[in-house]
Amino acid sequence: FINKTLLQKEHIRIPDNDWTWDEFYSLCEQLTRDTDGDGIIDQFGVYDYGWEEALVANGCSLFSEDGQHCLLNQSAQESAMQFARKIYQLNAGTDLSEKTFDEGRVAFRPMLFSEYRSYEPYPWRIKRSSNFEWTASPCPAAQASAAATTPG
């Protein structure tokens, strides 16, 4: 998900659907900052982007097709884990939550389809309240032309 309101406030264009890790990291780095001068980071680039999203974005999986071997020692998996850690470190140890996203203080958040449905009104669910406009987009890929989707 992309918080359109936050990007507009920061004069940042909404990324294209074929964005990459480099673009994603650069935007998150720009957006993660102390906005009120109290020394505490209160605006964030991303919430809830973890190793699972990074593995999918890098086109790799945790186990071999037959399920007999763990593949974490492969270079693509290692690269994905390193990227997830790099993204996590941007928040400088701040413990983010869904509430932080709902308050409009986070620019990007990967979501499962079931989570998406709680933000979009439909007959069996009440729309979750938010004070910002948002849009959906594929997660950034490790490299150009490799659109990623959220696992799950």
Regions from the PLM with identified roles:
Residues 2:
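A conserved hydrophobic position in a structured secondary element of the catalytic/binding core
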Residues 5-17:
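Aromatic-glycine-rich donor-binding/catalytic loop that engages nucleotide-sugar donors
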Residues 7, 25-30, 95-109:
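Short helices/loops that flank or line small-molecule/ion binding pockets
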Residues 8, 22-70:
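Extracytoplasmic/periplasmic solute-binding protein
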Residues 25-30, 66-96:
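Glycine-centered hinge/linker elements that transmit conformational signals in sensory
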Residues 33-44, 104-107, 130-135:
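Loop/turn elements at helix/coil->beta-strand transitions in domains of secreted/extracellular proteins
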Residues 107-112, 117-119:
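Paired acidic/hydrophobic, glycine-rich loop segments that form the ligand-binding mouth/hinge
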Residues 124-152:
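Extracytoplasmic/periplasmic substrate-recognition and gating elements
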